[in-house]
């Protein structure tokens, strides 16, 4: 029984959690189409609701490598000083690559991940170290994430990129699979804002995730309230960070395999 569950983890879909990635990759020639919707809401003294939406095409290339292409839409609704509601919308494109170094079936699964994204006048680079391990019907995953955010600016008649923000995030997730089609667990995220080498805050999120799946599809839902700012600074002295981050995030993913 333990071996059969390890095989399920190793060979099935590559996504189990709403936020945390696993080391699985699609077999060569297989591809997924995924629809993402993330709502972020709750700012201090302000109405705020952001919707991040993605359409993803993901394909296995063989040799433990897969790639994916995303079309992204970002919309924000927020109240201004006069309590009027304003809205902004941006579009973007992303390309990710994942290389599985080892599988979680008999030892710790290890994968390396890289993503480049374009959004308005911003260019983003993201890397992940992915670790996971299956224990019978349980799956544990850990991600260490580093980002580099570059923003285009024009100064003195010249174009330049401002690369001040380098956030770091640590993600930990655990899921128990009650049967081959349903699992439930928890995810915890520690997001650290770093700018110009200064560690500004450390925002902790914790919430449940469910995964419901069939042979050719899956549905994932994640609810993630902000718990606390565990690294208080002069710039961010509060118990929570609710100006640059939101009180609550919720995500739904629907995927189809071919």
Sequence positions of predicted segments:
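Cleavable N-terminal export/targeting peptides
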Residues: 1-17
């Amino acid at each position: 029984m333990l071996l059969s569950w390890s095989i399920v983890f190793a060979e099935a879909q590559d996504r189990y959690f709403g936020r945390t990635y696993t080391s699985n990759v699609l077999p060569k020639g297989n591809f997924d189409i995924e629809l993402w919707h993330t709502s972020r809401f709750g700012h201090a003294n302000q109405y705020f609701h952001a919707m991040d939406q993605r359409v993803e095409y993901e394909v296995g290339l063989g040799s433990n490598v897969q790639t994916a292409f995303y079309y992204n839409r970002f919309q924000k609704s927020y109240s201004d000083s006069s309590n009027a509601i304003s809205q902004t919308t941006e579009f973007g494109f992303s390309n990710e690559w994942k290389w599985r170094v080892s599988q979680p079936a008999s030892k710790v699964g290890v994968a390396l991940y890289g993503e480049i994204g374009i959004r308005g006048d911003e260019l983003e680079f993201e890397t992940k170290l992915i670790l996971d391990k299956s224990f019978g019907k349980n799956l544990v995953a850990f991600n260490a994430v580093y980002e580099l955010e570059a923003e285009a600016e024009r100064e003195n008649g010249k174009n330049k990129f401002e690369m001040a923000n380098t956030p770091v995030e640590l993600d930990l997730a655990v899921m128990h699979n009650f049967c081959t089609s349903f699992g439930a667990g928890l995810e915890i995220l520690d997001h650290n804002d770093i700018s110009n080498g200064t560690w500004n805050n450390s925002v902790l999120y914790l919430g449940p995730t469910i995964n419901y799946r069939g042979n050719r599809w899956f549905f994932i839902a994640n609810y993630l309230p902000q718990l606390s700012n565990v690294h208080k600074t002069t710039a961010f002295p509060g118990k929570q960070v609710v100006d640059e981050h939101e009180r609550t995030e919720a995500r739904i993913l629907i995927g189809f395999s071919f």
